[in-house]
């Protein structure tokens, strides 16, 4: 199993249990689904319910949302406007370029060439995006973007993460 973590915060962002697509060698698209699940619903294999004390029936809480967000404990955040988002992108890209120059100089030119197209595309879709930080809620790290796309007639959540802002870890 592989997990992708934010290079600045160490937060888990997603894993290879989801369908992944690398776009322009700079952006991962992670395809999720909307789920609902019961919290605190513990099933003991082999337990004999008739031999147990009567359950007084507690209200089971449910949570629903995008599986990637729930499973990796991503936290929704936001930007007041497109200008604030643009400022974040510019600052974050500077941090990524600096890190690439130090650790992977051969990737810098590809990154700079392809990221402009991707950023322009993201800014054009700003109103359709939701934004998520990792579990630490550190806004200095990667802020993932989520949008819904019509795939085969279904509304599918797609998480967008900058490839160079992630490190891959194998388990």
Curated annotation (Swiss-Prot):
Disulfide bonds: none
Family the UniProt entry places it in: Belongs to the TCTP family.
Keyword Calcium belongs to the record: yes
Subcellular location: Cytoplasm
UniProt name for this protein: Translationally-controlled tumor protein homolog
Swiss-Prot/TrEMBL keywords: Calcium, Cytoplasm
GO MF assignments: calcium ion binding
GO cellular component annotations of the record: cytoplasm
Taxonomy of the source species: Eukaryota, Metazoa, Ecdysozoa, Arthropoda, Hexapoda
Domain TCTP: 1-171
Annotated InterPro entries: Mss4-like_sf, Mss4/transl-control_tumour, TCTP, Translation_control_tumour_CS, Translational_control_tumour_p
Principal location: cytoplasm
Biological function: Involved in calcium binding and microtubule stabilization.
Species this protein is from: Aedes aegypti
Pfam families given in the database record: TCTP
Keyword Cytoplasm found: yes
């Amino acid at each position: 199993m592989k997990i992708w973590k934010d290079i600045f915060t160490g937060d888990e962002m997603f894993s290879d249990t989801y369908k992944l697509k690398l776009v322009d060698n700079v952006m991962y698209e992670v395809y999720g689904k909307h789920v609902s699940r019961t919290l605190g619903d513990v099933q003991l294999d082999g337990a004999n319910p008739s031999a147990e004390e009567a359950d007084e029936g507690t209200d089971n809480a449910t949570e629903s949302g995008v599986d990637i967000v729930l499973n990796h404990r991503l936290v929704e955040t936001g930007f007041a406007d497109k200008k604030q988002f643009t400022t974040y992108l510019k600052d974050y890209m500077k941090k990524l370029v600096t890190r690439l120059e130090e650790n992977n100089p051969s990737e810098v030119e590809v990154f700079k060439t392809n990221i402009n197209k991707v950023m322009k595309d993201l800014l054009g879709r700003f109103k359709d995006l939701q934004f998520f930080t990792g579990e630490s809620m550190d806004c200095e790290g990667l802020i993932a973007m989520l949008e819904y796309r019509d795939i085969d007639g279904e509304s599918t959540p797609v998480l967008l993460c900058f490839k160079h802002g992630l490190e891959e870890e194998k388990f």
